Amino acid sequence: MDMLFAKTVVLAASAVGAGTAMIAGIGPGVGQGYAAGKAVESVARQPEAKGDIISTMVLGQAVAESTGIYSLVIALILLYANPFVGLLG
């Protein structure tokens, strides 16, 4: 296999993989919006529990955001520090 063709295939597959990884950012965004909306509803129903509701919401959003950050890191690695290009020689 021609080395230029192999490198092109690896870079194209990396771009597709990075795009697919960034699709994973949709889930945390939708989940965080839903959680924030439900927290607002909960505070409206029970204002005296505002502190507990907000702290639980922030903790849940931090956990949800971690998956989006991981997908961003994977996409950046695939695009700018691709370990597979070095294996070609």
UniProtKB/Swiss-Prot annotation:
Residue pairs linked by disulfide bridges in the UniProt entry: none
Any single Pfam family the record assigns to this protein: ATP-synt_C
HAMAP family xref list: ATP_synth_c_bact
Subcellular localization, as worded in the UniProt entry: Cell inner membrane
Description of how the protein assembles with itself and partners: F-type ATPases have 2 components, F(1) - the catalytic core - and F(0) - the membrane sodium channel. F(1) has five subunits: alpha(3), beta(3), gamma(1), delta(1), epsilon(1). F(0) has three main subunits: a(1), b(2) and c(11). The alpha and beta chains form an alternating ring which encloses part of the gamma chain. F(1) is attached to F(0) by a central stalk formed by the gamma and epsilon chains, while a peripheral stalk is formed by the delta and b chains.
Keywords: ATP synthesis, Cell inner membrane, Cell membrane, CF(0), Hydrogen ion transport, Ion transport, Lipid-binding, Membrane, Sodium, Sodium transport, Transmembrane, Transmembrane helix, Transport
Miscellaneous comment text of the record: The ATPase of I.tartaricus is of special interest because it uses sodium ions instead of protons as the physiological coupling ion.
Primary role: F(1)F(0) ATP synthase produces ATP from ADP in the presence of a proton or sodium gradient. F-type ATPases consist of two structural domains, F(1) containing the extramembraneous catalytic core and F(0) containing the membrane sodium channel, linked together by a central stalk and a peripheral stalk. During catalysis, ATP synthesis in the catalytic domain of F(1) is coupled via a rotary mechanism of the central stalk subunits to sodium translocation. Key component of the F(0) channel; it plays a direct role in translocation across the membrane. A homomeric c-ring of 11 subunits forms the central stalk rotor element with the F(1) delta and epsilon subunits.
Segments crossing the lipid bilayer: 9-29, 68-88
Matches recorded under SUPFAM superfamilies: F1F0 ATP synthase subunit C
UniProt site (Reversibly binds sodium during transport): E65
GO molecular function annotations of the record: lipid binding; proton-transporting ATP synthase activity, rotational mechanism
Membrane topology: Multi-pass membrane protein
Stated family: Belongs to the ATPase C chain family.
Primary site of residence: membrane
Gene3D superfamilies in alphabetical order: lithium bound rotor ring of v- atpase
Cytoplasmic topological domain residue ranges: 30-67
GO BP annotations, alphabetical order: sodium ion transport
Domain of life: Bacteria
InterPro entries: ATP_synth_csu_bac/chlpt, ATP_synth_F0_csu, ATP_synth_F0_csu_DDCD_BS, ATPase_proteolipid_c-like_dom, F/V-ATP_Csub_sf
Organism: Ilyobacter tartaricus
Periplasmic-facing ranges: 1-8, 89
GO cellular component: plasma membrane; proton-transporting ATP synthase complex; proton-transporting two-sector ATPase complex, proton-transporting domain
Protein name as catalogued: ATP synthase subunit c, sodium ion specific
